[in-house]
Curated annotation (Swiss-Prot):
Reactions performed catalytically: alpha-D-xylose = alpha-D-xylulofuranose
InterPro entries: Xyl_isomerase-like_sf (IPR036237), Xylose_isom_bac (IPR013452), Xylose_isomerase (IPR001998)
Keywords: Carbohydrate metabolism, Cytoplasm, Isomerase, Magnesium, Metal-binding, Xylose metabolism
Compartment list: Cytoplasm
Residues at the catalytic site: 101, 104
A biological-process GO annotation: D-xylose metabolic process
Family matches, as SUPFAM superfamilies: Xylose isomerase-like
Assigned EC number: 5.3.1.5
Single GO term (MF): magnesium ion binding
Positions that bind Mg(2+) 1: 232, 268, 296, 339
Name used for this protein in its record: Xylose isomerase
Co-factor requirement: Mg(2+)
Gene responsible for this protein: xylA
Source organism of the structure: Shigella boydii serotype 4 (strain Sb227)
Length: 425
């Protein structure tokens, strides 16, 4: 079959002085950073949905891209053609992983039976593509938000039959992820929230969502899936309010249903922006709570109130993010998935490469700066000094539960405490 991107062999590293827009300037997969190859640190993934499924339509205009696999035709044949192009792209871009929703890779069909049969055929296609290319699956997931049946949510839907249909999709998508050697399975509740409280039973919907997640965990163990389960927080859009608002909110939810040791987080930069947080904040919070799993690398726009899913371009912001990740030991099953799309005006097929190359170079340079921060150690030293009082006898007695509130009041009076503020620098 003729290559779709026939004017490009593979994207290669040419160094920071290169003027070639189809070459890496900072991402050198084999370069050692803190003793580990850059490729192993970053674990780049390209997403199926924005890259190959979006046709360029928006709220005010029809599709603008005119991709060959988005034309009228036999659905499975078009899905196979899309897979051909996707894996050509992954290979030429030098990404190690990819990610998908079930209906990104397979036609949904007109019934559950058609959905399951179509997906089974496409899983075999994807398995062959993975074997041929060496590209692996970072994570799979089920799209339980696009079809009109999910207008009022999936797990939080008032109708248990919709809940059951969603369960079928998750079972099928998780088993497909398992068969394809996926390293994670993601749960994003696009419509697990509400439009108005006037027709919403918050307690009921929370109980439904909690039970659904418990069943997901049960099924993971039943089929022997060794990957990580990930929830992806987002505060709103398409609903007015989503129940997985941010990292801290999800932690409270997981604790309530006894799932905090079973599920971790997939943090997206743009979702942090929508929640009123920095990307750095959400990563640091997930790490502090022991829930850090993976990253959707993109960016939003602080002046816009929706999910713009732009490619990351801030080395400063992402150096701080990579610094936190390196300090925490780096990725295990997770990675950096580019949940990002070209703009509607970017109709040239090679624009897909320009966007990803710039993003990969941004994250690579951010990694190198973060590594220098680790090696320098100055920031860690200052933080350790700032909290050094907690290593004292008093600090340790407080933390170990050896002093009560009344004990501390007595201690403060007996020692005539008069602490002086120390600069935070």
């Amino acid at each position: 079959m003729q290559a779709y991107f026939d004017q490009l062999d593979r994207v290669r590293y040419e160094g920071s002085k290169s003027s070639n827009p189809l070459a890496f300037r900072h991402y050198n997969p084999d370069e050692l950073v803190l003793g580990k190859r850059m490729e192993e640190h970053l674990r780049f993934a390209a997403c199926y949905w924005h890259t190959f499924c979006w046709n360029g339509a928006d709220m005010f205009g029809v599709g603008a891209f005119n991709r060959p696999w988005q034309q009228p035709g036999e659905a499975l044949a078009l899905a196979k053609r899309k897979a051909d192009v996707a894996f050509e792209f992954f290979h030429k871009l030098h990404v190690s992983f990819y990610c998908f929703h079930d209906v990104d890779v397979s036609p949904e069909g007109a019934s559950l039976k058609e959905y399951i049969n179509n997906f089974a055929q496409m899983v075999d296609v994807l398995a062959a593509k993975q074997e041929e290319s060496g590209v692996k699956l970072l994570w799979g997931t089920a799209n339980c938000f696009t079809n009109p049946r999910y207008g009022a949510g999936a797990a939080t839907n008032p109708d248990p039959e919709v809940f059951s249909w969603a369960a079928t999709q998750v079972v099928t998508a998780m088993e497909a992820t398992h068969k394809l050697g996926g390293e994670n399975y993601v749960l994003w509740g696009g419509r697990e929230g509400y439009e108005t409280l006037l027709n919403t039973d918050l307690r009921q919907e929370r109980e439904q969502l909690g039970r659904f997640m418990q069943m997901v965990v049960e099924h993971k163990h039943k089929i022997g899936f060794q990957g990580t389960l990930l929830i992806e927080p987002k505060p709103q859009e398409p609903t007015k309010h989503q129940y997985d608002y941010d990292a801290a909110t999800v932690y409270g939810f997981l604790k309530q249903f006894g799932l905090e040791k079973e599920i971790k987080l997939n943090i997206e930069a743009n979702h942090a922006t929508l929640a009123g947080h920095s990307f750095h904040h959400e990563i640091a919070t997930a790490i502090a709570l022991g829930l850090f799993g993976s990253v959707d690398a993109n960016r939003g726009d602080a002046q816009l109130g929706w999910d713009t899913d732009q490619f990351p371009n801030s080395v400063e912001e992402n150096a701080l993010v990579m610094y936190e990740i390196l300090k925490a030991g780096g990725f295990t099953t997770g990675g950096l998935n580019f949940d990002a799309k070209v703009r509607r005006q970017s109709t040239d097929k090679y624009d897909l490469f320009y966007g990803h190359i710039g993003a990969m170079d941004t994250m690579a340079l951010a990694l190198k700066i973060a590594a220098r921060m680790i090696e320098d150690g100055e920031l860690d030293k200052r933080i350790a000094q700032r909290y050094s009082g907690w290593n004292s006898e008093l600090g340790q007695q407080i933390l170990k539960g050896q002093m009560s509130l009344a004990d501390l009041a007595k201690y403060a009076q007996e020692h005539n405490l008069s602490p002086v503020h120390q600069s935070g620098r």
